[in-house]
Regions:
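A generic transmembrane alpha-helix motif of multi-pass inner-membrane proteins
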Residues: 1-17, 194-243, 247, 252-253, ...
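Extracellular loop-to-transmembrane helix junctions
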Residues: 2-19, 23, 77-108, 117, ...
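Selective recognition of specific alpha-helical transmembrane segments in multi-pass small-molecule
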Residues: 10-20, 136, 143, 198-202, ...
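Membrane-interface "cap" regions at the ends of multi-pass membrane proteins
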Residues: 17-71, 254, 293-294, 298, ...
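Flexible loop linkers connecting adjacent transmembrane helices
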Residues: 23-50, 74-76, 86, 90, ...
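Membrane-interface helix-loop-helix modules in multi-pass membrane proteins
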Residues: 52-111, 122-126, 139-161, 334-359, ...
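Hydrophobic, membrane-embedded alpha-helices of multi-pass small-molecule transporters
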Residues: 53-69, 220-240, 266-273, 285-325, ...
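Loop-to-transmembrane helix boundary motifs in multi-pass membrane proteins
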Residues: 126-141, 336-343, 416-426, 431, ...
Length: 621
């Protein structure tokens, strides 16, 4: 199938959804009004609450939400064929994912930029808020493990890739000092940005030289060695001042992310590769070598972030609402950024499905499993020679995405000789996608864990306490590091996808309670329908994964500990999610019966009055 008309249709759907559906949400449901004072202005402290230009906020928000999910999930879901993945990526993002992000962002802005657990506490109740806080800590740990396993598989036994990624750390440190400390009182942007771009290009070129030299053995590391390096990196990145590593790395990666996505979209439209996968494969009925379950429900937890992501609710109720200058800009940032991430997922699926079927499975499953599939690789040896890396058995998704991306650019005139560079640039692109989320996510996990421990011992809540920061960061890193050390993409990714989707259901149910509590019950169906669908698919996947994978691991000698940990994590998160969702539903019923909601303050206008939005409940019919 030719991808050109397909891509034009998909981009058209995104444009129509943004133009009309997001406008309906902004005007009719949320009644966004630039007269409302945003938290960035109300609490402007020059540190956390800072009114910022909308393009700057969009870049920050997109860099924070765009991790491995839209790249890896659709690539793995190609096992089912291109049709199921494309349908869910587009429909899920338009009707569920973008609604989830937009609603959570506006809800947080109306709660002074506070977090999702705080909104649960305010709109549903204190006990449910505590459950949500615990669920968020568990989700962060699982999410970091899911992202880290992808990086481990991408960098394992690849001197070129590991050297290039390693060099981004000193580059970011130099940029951080140059931008924020070289001239006290000023923040430099242009010169450090030029330096970062040039240094990154030189690191990519130098990686090729290192891989062919005697230094290659230093960077040819196995999975466990890379896990240790990632844990050390995550610990340092979450405890160092944000200006030193986190901010410059995010800033640099944003340009690379957006530039690469634009280049890949242009490449797909220019080359318009033919999809070599069928619309549906035999694995839609189960028994697949990558994802053993059926297309329902495992497609939805596999694609995860590309269509809807609960992790986004932590960003939409974290730093982003503290930066928005005008309330109407939430539409562009909340709804628009999710559509761009969905487009990334579509491009990843196209890149995977444009490969030969035999080559795709030869890369994404272990050789022993591939030998039983009855398939033969067609271009694998040639591709390995072109990219300068062994490709067979490089499971996890990132390598096959990089191969698909390199093949697309191979078809652009003048680019054929640069295939190996495009491949390793794609690995760099993916790793930067993921590492920016790992360092930010570990820091978010530290904040939430300290907030939780505050209920036990007050000093834990102080972010100025070095001991508290080190202990909380160390705990988060050890937890996700343990999961990665003994896990695989086959066990961790379903766990990540399930926890991530359940967090989305928690956020949507909380936002439903918020709408009902604030007199918008007539529009509650906008969040109830996606919440119900996500909950049904995810609970089904959780039960099947636990009974079919994690519990058998817990009863098998050699994997008992890992199996028990993953069984307990999955069970705990499911129970926590169900508690929050049930109590959110009960809160809605109470409000509709006239019981006053816990929180019913309307937004404050710039002239000191309150916005004329109904705080009293009303019935929807």
């Amino acid at each position: 199938m030719n991808t050109l008309p397909l891509m034009l249709i998909i981009v058209g759907i995104y444009a129509v959804a943004y133009r009309y559906y997001s406008a309906f949400l902004a005007s009719r449901v949320f009644a966004l009004d630039d007269r409302n004072i945003t938290p960035a202005h109300r609490f402007n402290d020059g540190h956390n609450y800072v009114p910022s230009p909308r393009w700057v906020v969009f870049g920050h928000h997109f860099a924070a939400i765009a991790g491995a999910g839209p790249l890896v999930g659709p690539t793995l879901a190609a096992q089912f064929g291109y049709a199921p993945g494309l349908l869910w990526l587009v429909a899920g993002a338009v009707l569920a994912g973008a609604v989830h992000d937009f609603t959570t962002l506006v809800g947080s802005m109306r709660h002074d930029g506070r977090s999702l657990p705080h909104m649960v506490l305010s709109e549903v109740g204190p006990v449910t808020g505590m459950v949500a806080l615990i669920a968020v800590v568990i989700d962060v740990i699982i999410a970091m493990a899911g992202l880290a396993i992808v990086v481990v598989n991408a960098l394992s036994q690849s001197a070129w890739s590991l050297f290039t990624i390693g060099m981004t750390i000193p580059i970011a440190l130099v940029m951080g000092w140059w931008m924020f400390k070289s001239q006290p009182g000023r923040v430099l942007v242009l010169a450090p940005s030029i330096f970062g771009a040039i240094a990154l290009a030189l690191a990519l070129i130098a990686g090729h030289a290192v891989a062919g030299s005697s230094l290659a053995s230093i960077f040819l590391l196995g999975n466990h060695q890379i896990v240790i390096i990632l844990c050390v990196y995550g610990f340092l990145a979450s405890t160092l001042p944000v200006w030193m590593l986190l901010e410059p790395r995010d800033y640099l990666s944003t340009y690379i992310k957006i530039g690469t996505i634009a280049a890949l979209l242009i490449g797909v439209l220019y080359v318009h590769p033919r999809l070599q996968f069928p619309a549906f494969t035999q694995y839609v009925h189960g028994g697949g070598p990558i994802i053993p379950g059926k297309v329902f429900p495992f497609l939805f937890v596999t694609i995860a972030c590309g269509a809807i992501s609960g992790f986004h609710s932590l960003v939409s109720s974290g730093t982003t609402p503290k930066l928005i200058d005008k309330e109407t800009e939430a539409r562009f940032i909340g709804y628009g950024a999710m559509l761009v991430e969905s487009l990334v997922g579509v491009l990843a699926l196209v890149a995977a499905c444009s490969m030969n079927v035999g080559d795709y499975f030869a890369i994404n499953v272990p050789p022993s499993v591939f030998a039983r599939l009855g398939l033969q690789p067609v271009h694998l040896a040639e591709l390995s020679k072109l990219v300068g890396e062994p490709l067979a058995g490089r499971t996890g998704g990132p390598v096959s995405f990089a191969v698909g991306m390199a093949e697309i650019f191979h078809g652009v005139p003048g680019m054929a000789r640069l295939t190996s560079y495009w491949f390793h640039f794609a690995i760099l692109f993916e790793a930067l996608f993921i590492l920016t989320t790992i360092d930010a996510g570990t820091r978010v996990g530290r904040y939430v864990l300290q907030e939780l421990l505050n209920k036990v011992h007050k000093p834990f809540a102080s972010t100025r306490s070095l001991a508290a920061n080190l202990l909380a960061s160390g705990f988060i890193v050890l937890c996700w590091g343990y999961l990665v050390w003994g896990g695989s993409i086959a066990t961790i990714w379903p766990l990540f996808g399930t926890a991530n989707q359940l967090l989305a259901a928690i956020a949507l149910s909380t936002m439903t309670a918020w709408l009902v509590n604030h007199g918008k019950a007539a529009f509650a169906w906008l969040t109830i329908i996606p919440a119900a669908f996500v909950l049904a698919t995810t609970i089904s996947a959780a039960v099947l994964s636990t009974t079919g994978v994690y519990w058998p691991m817990a009863r098998h000698p050699g994997t008992e500990a890992q199996g028990w940990v993953e069984t307990i994590l999955m069970t705990a998160f499911v129970v926590g999610a169900v508690i929050v969702i049930v109590f959110s539903a009960l809160r809605c019923i109470q409000t509709l019966r006239g019981v006053p909601p816990p929180y019913a303050r309307a937004p404050e206008l710039r002239d000191g009055r309150t916005s004329p939005q109904p705080a009293a409940p009303f019935r929807c019919c």
